[in-house]
């Protein structure tokens, strides 16, 4: 089985192989997104409190993103290293990476659970919570935080299944959890009357099932690389390269948290709870664009990394071209949808007429440049697949830290409608970041391939 997977990666037709890995990865990303979207859809329609509760849950997003950031520090850093080691025929090294990564995820879970549980109320105030929305944010957040170990294991260990070529198994991890979440949400939120607490409990339970599924597979007979007890002890020489490569994804997600704080605090200042509520809806919708793109890149990563490790330059190039075409095509279709029917999309998340109206105009502004994001993510993630941690990190910082976050605070000073200025920062940064990232990638791509995997 292992030999067949390696043969497919190194010699099978590239496009069918990519689709075989990308489709389950995209489905997994979309299904994983349902954990939060389904919660928000149900919460937004709770009679009498829907808009306030939805806004409160949205304010918890920065903490949720930080949890995901620590998970992907390990998953996004370890999976490419594992694939490169496997491509070079070093199975023992690949299994050491998996074992060390698992231990680090458990360590992060303990530290983050203690810190975020104690600091949740103060942090949520800082993010822009009002007296009306804080109770819902705390109620949802503290339960979610208590289950963070399952969140980190699912997000952090699932890439190690995908990178071995078991994309369908990886997809089932999120499908199983999402189905359980969808079933439990209405029962706990409405049936038992638990409200936002019910949504959090449903999410934690579904993530726990997903974590058990992953551990069963990685310790079972079907996997190529096993999670072994003898490799759980952390070794500096093993974990530091993982952290070095994963820091790019960590920065991407942690700055996403900082970005969310910047948006929510600015909008709370200029527009109050309704503006923050609109941003909650817009953020959920925008993830329907960005996460499938990341799924495409996640599916392409094992093929690019393996063939880079094996020194097969032409196959790496073919994989990248196909990945870029899919990413740009998807973002173009998504952009057309957002420009055409933003009000219909907003109505899925809330029945509050005022919130729908506000979200409709805000969404058109925010999404105006999103078609360019496909180019930026495809290029930036390809740097990761090729082991180029420093360049990938710089590009991860570019859009959010260097461009978007400053623009959120600068642009409102140049327009009469301050909230318009806040939302306008997004498309401006999207277009600038995509242009710079594409130029950087295409000027370096051939040089990286010529150097080969030995210097990754």
Show where each model-derived region lies.
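Residue-level signal for transmembrane alpha-helical positions in Major Facilitator Superfamily
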Residues: 19, 34-35, 74, 115-119, ...
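Helix-terminus/linker motif at the lipid-water interface of multi-pass membrane proteins
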Residues: 30, 34-55, 124-131, 187-194, ...
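Transmembrane helical elements of multi-pass membrane transporters/channels
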Residues: 20-39, 143, 177, 206-210, ...
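Short runs within selected transmembrane alpha-helices of multi-pass transporters and secretion channels
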Residues: 75, 144-162, 170-178, 199-212, ...
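N-terminal transmembrane alpha-helices
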Residues: 9-49, 62-77, 81, 106-113, ...
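Short alpha-helical transmembrane segments in multi-pass integral membrane proteins
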Residues: 1-25, 82-149, 191-247, 304-369, ...
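Small-residue-rich hydrophobic transmembrane alpha-helices
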Residues: 54-114, 151-170, 264, 278-336, ...
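Interfacial/gating helices of multi-pass transporter permease domains
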Residues: 20, 43-65, 132-136, 196-197, ...
């Amino acid at each position: 089985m292992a030999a067949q997977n390696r043969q497919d990666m190194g010699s099978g037709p590239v496009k069918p192989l990519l689709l075989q890995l990308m489709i389950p990865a995209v489905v997994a990303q979309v299904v994983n997104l349902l954990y939060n979207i389904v919660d928000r859809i149900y919460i937004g329609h709770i009679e009498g409190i829907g808009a306030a509760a939805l806004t409160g849950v949205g304010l918890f997003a920065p903490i949720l993103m930080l949890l995901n950031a620590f998970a992907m520090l390990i998953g996004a850093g370890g999976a490419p290293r594992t694939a490169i080691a496997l491509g070079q025929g070093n199975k023992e090294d690949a299994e050491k990476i998996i074992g060390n990564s698992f231990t680090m995820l458990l360590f992060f879970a303990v530290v983050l659970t203690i810190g975020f549980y104690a600091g949740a109320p103060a942090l949520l105030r800082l993010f822009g919570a009002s007296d009306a929305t804080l109770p819902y944010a705390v109620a949802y957040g503290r339960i979610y935080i208590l289950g963070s170990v399952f969140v980190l294991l699912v997000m952090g260990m699932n890439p190690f299944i995908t990178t071995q070529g078991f994309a369908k198994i990886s997809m089932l991890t999120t499908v199983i959890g999402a189905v359980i979440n969808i079933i439990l949400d209405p029962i706990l939120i409405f049936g038992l009357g638990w409200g936002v607490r019910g949504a959090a409990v449903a999410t934690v339970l579904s993530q726990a099932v997903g974590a058990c599924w992953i551990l069963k597979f990685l310790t079972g007979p079907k996997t190529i690389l096993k999670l072994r007890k003898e490799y759980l002890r952390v070794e500096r020489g093993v974990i530091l390269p993982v952290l070095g490569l994963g820091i790019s994804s960590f920065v991407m997600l942690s700055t996403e948290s900082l970005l969310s704080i910047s948006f929510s605090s600015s909008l709370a200042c200029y527009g109050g709870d309704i503006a923050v509520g609109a941003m909650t809806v817009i953020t959920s919708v925008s993830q329907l664009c960005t996460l499938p793109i990341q799924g495409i890149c996640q599916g392409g990563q094992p093929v690019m990394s393996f063939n880079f490790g094996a020194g097969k330059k032409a196959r790496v190039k073919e994989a990248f071209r196909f990945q870029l075409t899919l990413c740009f095509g998807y973002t173009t279709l998504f952009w057309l949808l957002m420009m055409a029917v933003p009000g219909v999309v907003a109505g899925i998340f809330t029945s509050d007429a005022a919130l729908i109206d506000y979200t409709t105009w805000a969404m058109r502004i925010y999404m105006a440049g999103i078609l360019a994001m496909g180019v930026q993510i495809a290029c930036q993630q390809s740097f990761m697949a090729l082991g180029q941690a420093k360049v990938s990190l710089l590009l991860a910082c570019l859009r959010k830290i260097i461009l978007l976050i400053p623009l959120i605070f600068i642009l409102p000073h140049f327009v009469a409608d301050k909230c318009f200025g806040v939302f306008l920062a997004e498309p401006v940064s999207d277009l600038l970041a995509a242009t710079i990232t594409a130029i950087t990638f295409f000027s370096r791509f051939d040089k990286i391939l010529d150097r080969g995997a030995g210097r990754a």
